[in-house]
Regions:
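Long, low-complexity inter-transmembrane loops of multi-pass membrane transporters
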Residues: 1-20, 24, 199-316, 343, ...
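C-terminal transmembrane helical hairpin of 12-TM major facilitator-type secondary transporters
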Residues: 315, 324, 339-342, 346-348, ...
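Helix-breaking motifs and short loop linkers at transmembrane-helix boundaries and internal kinks
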Residues: 61, 93, 114-116, 148-149, ...
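Helix-to-loop junctions at the C-terminal end of transmembrane segments
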Residues: 81-94, 361-375, 460-461
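Intracellular juxtamembrane helix-capping segments at the cytosolic ends
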Residues: 56, 133-148, 155-156, 416-429
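Hydrophobic core of transmembrane alpha-helices in multi-pass small-molecule transporters
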Residues: 40, 108, 119-135, 319, ...
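Extracytoplasmic gate region of multi-pass secondary transporters
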Residues: 45-56, 296, 301-366, 452
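Conserved MFS/SLC helix-loop-helix module at the cytosolic interface between two early adjacent transmembrane helices
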Residues: 80-119
């Protein structure tokens, strides 16, 4: 087989350039440590709600539905404010936003101890703690995402280990505090512990001061070298004659012209025409100013992402998953105490077993994901199936040994739903849109969680059955599978077709 070689084409010319890349480690490990420290005392409060506030809500005359109202209000605020938190991260920095969030958490837990009715809890735990968790969640993920590229899943998993440590230790701490200091004293001491999160958030330094320098060979534009070799170039003149042929230039002229090749000249006639048809300068300035303002808002909140149907499908799916997991965390301690008839010590043991297995899962499953190059969406689908099966079996058990074993299995599967939630969103958008994408994901959670959380609480109170409530929680994960699996299979088939199309091209180029 013979091929024709274009005489203008030259061999590939390369040059070495210094490129700044994320460290994929380095100070990033300190960022993970700071995030974990903040999660121990703040994010873990989500799973402690029933232990801390359960008896107080009963004294106020409220049952599962009342608890669902408070928890749903917190989820609504923490997620509905996602775009705002993303905008604050862009305008200021992840560190500032995280410190602000830790302060909100401390204030919210402190004042919740003085609650005398459910609306006090909605204001303190729901609103103040919700704002704090919103800021912490968004800013810490953006910071970790900026430090890690290759080992992102492992980094997020390690950072979330702090939440697991809090979920393992804090139930026993809360039980001890409630027995010795009462509800109000417990809230005051928990707020003091929460303030330690500020120290962790201060470790979130900007990635730009820790960027790693690498030397990379890049291919120089071959067209420029082809023109240079043949000594051809367009000469820019003030009043060009369209019928005149472009002259040849020597090499020195060519190099100077190439530097300025982006200049554009227009004829006097076309300039005059533009001047006569241009609108009023003041009107043009005002319109440009308004358009610029709208463009900034458009870019700040990442509105362009909403035009992508796949992105919308992803954020709705992650919102359904988070709602299901969060609602089970609310119901599980009540199920253990009321349906399985366990005491507070046994309940705390089961919750600690969930947290311990969750921590093991966050340390091991991301490593397997990176090793086998599994997409975050596939990991979320597989763990959703795992969680559905385990929870449905668990709902029918009353033996403490079986409940401990199933708690371990559930915690192990639950780990990846937490780790992959934001990674799933960030995988499907550009890096500069990650803060906005995470914010929009939290917004969808804020829209979906309150009505669904209230509905799940109503099912429990109306039927009087924890089995029916847990089955309804699993139904949310079934919806995730129904909406995601067809899209993932379509992408898999499309990818295989593209590979088959490219293979003959590779063989042809080697001939």
């Amino acid at each position: 087989m013979t091929t024709t070689i274009n005489p203008l084409m030259s061999p590939h010319k390369t040059k070495k350039v210094i490129k700044l890349v994320p460290p994929d480690g380095g100070w990033g490990w300190m960022v993970i440590l700071g995030t974990a420290l903040s999660n121990i005392f703040n994010v873990s409060m989500l799973s402690l709600f029933s232990l801390v506030y359960g008896d107080a809500l009963e004294a106020m005359g409220h049952k599962t539905q009342g608890a669902a109202v408070v928890l749903s209000s917190m989820l609504f605020v923490s997620n509905f404010g996602g775009p705002v938190a993303g905008a604050i991260v862009k305008i200021t920095s992840p560190r500032f936003t995280a410190v602000m969030g830790a302060c909100f958490c401390t204030v919210g837990i402190f004042f919740s101890g003085f609650s005398t009715n459910i609306w006090h809890l909605v204001t303190t735990y729901g609103v103040l703690l919700g704002i704090g968790l919103d800021c912490i969640s968004n800013s810490t993920f953006v910071s970790i995402n900026s430090y890690f590229k290759q080992r992102k899943s492992q980094a997020v998993g390690l950072a979330n280990v702090g939440t697991n440590i809090g979920q393992m230790l804090m139930p026993h701490v809360v039980r001890y505090l409630l027995e010795n200091y009462g509800f109000r004293g417990t809230c005051l001491l928990l707020s003091a512990l929460s303030f330690n999160g500020v120290a962790g958030c201060l470790l979130l330094q900007p990635v730009k001061i820790h960027m790693k320098k690498i030397i990379e060979e890049v291919t120089v534009d071959e067209t420029i070298y082809s023109l240079e070799n043949e000594q051809f170039h367009m000469v820019v003149v003030e009043r060009p004659d369209l019928n005149q042929e472009l002259p040849k230039c020597n090499k020195q002229q060519t190099e100077m012209q190439l530097v300025n090749r982006s200049k554009i000249n227009v004829s006097k006639e076309s300039t005059d025409k533009l001047e006569t048809t241009s609108p009023n300068k003041n009107d043009s300035f005002e319109e440009g100013k308004e358009s610029n303002w709208l463009r900034k808002l458009y870019d700040l909140f990442g509105i362009v992402l909403l035009s992508d149907i796949r992105f919308i499908n992803i954020v709705i799916g992650t919102a359904l998953t988070t709602t299901s997991i969060a609602n089970f965390s609310l119901v599980y301690p009540l199920f253990l105490q009321n349906a399985a008839s366990l005491d507070k010590q046994q309940t705390a043991n089961c919750m600690s077993a969930v947290a311990a297995a969750d921590m093991v899962g966050r340390l091991t499953l991301p490593v397997l994901q990176d090793k086998f190059k599994i997409k975050a969406r596939w990991m979320l689908i597989m763990t959703a199936i795992w969680v559905i099966v385990i929870r449905q079996i668990l709902a029918h058990q009353t033996d403490v040994t079986l409940l401990l074993a199933l708690s371990i299995l559930y915690g192990f599967g639950r780990s990846m739903t937490v780790v992959t939630k934001n990674i799933t969103i960030s995988e499907n958008c550009k890096s500069e849109l990650v803060p906005a994408a995470v914010g929009l994901g939290m917004l969808s959670m804020g829209i979906i969680a309150p009505p669904l959380g209230y509905f799940l609480g109503w099912i429990r109170d109306y039927t009087g059955s924890y089995i029916a409530c847990i089955a309804a929680q699993n139904a949310l994960l079934v919806i995730l599978l129904v909406t995601w699996l067809p899209d993932m299979l379509y992408l898999h088939i499309k990818s295989n077709k593209e590979k088959k199309t490219l293979d003959p091209i590779k063989v042809f180029t080697k001939m």
